[in-house]
A protein has these predicted regions:
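Sec-dependent signal peptide recognition
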Residues: 1-8
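N-terminal signal peptide c-region/cleavage motif recognized by signal peptidases
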Residues: 12-14
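Boundary of Sec targeting at the N-terminus
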Residues: 16-18
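A cross-family detector of function-defining hotspots
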Residues: 27-138
């Protein structure tokens, strides 16, 4: 497997949100939401849409914390390799890297972040970045 080395610049740290951040932290980075929707248990969880830095970004919040983020190009064109690299770079903390993992047969390109807490999938139209929740059987 190949490790994608992510070069982070200071701009990326200050301008983009990370999985696990609160709604206030993400709004401080992306600006005011363009659209807000509710889902899940009694509508307490939300999907919030932003437009920032060339991307349309849909963020899924569970109990007020970002758990999933989907990045689309604003012009609605297919995601380029360069755009995928940008999303991976902005979805990692300093010192973290992304490792490509073998996709399922005919599956999309997939990566795991070096801390083991986040994965990313590129569908061709968008990049989905998700927190990984491990549920241990009781």
């Amino acid at each position: 497997m190949k490790t994608l080395v992510v070069v982070l610049v200071l701009f990326a740290q200050s301008a983009f949100a990370l999985i696990g951040e609160s709604e206030k932290q993400i709004e401080a980075r992306y600006g005011h939401p363009k659209k807000v929707g509710k889902f899940g248990r009694g509508g307490e969880d939300r999907t919030v849409s932003y437009a920032a830095h060339g991307f349309a970004i849909d963020v899924g919040f569970v109990a007020g914390i970002s758990r999933a983020e989907a990045f689309y190009l604003l012009d609605k064109s297919p995601i380029t390799e360069d755009a995928v690299k940008r999303v991976l770079a902005i979805s990692a903390n300093k010192g973290q890297t992304w490792e490509s993992v073998p996709p399922a047969p005919n599956g999309p390109p997939t990566w795991h972040r070096s801390d083991g807490k986040v994965m990313a999938i590129s569908t061709g139209q968008f990049v989905n970045v998700n927190g990984i929740t491990v549920v241990k059987p009781e």
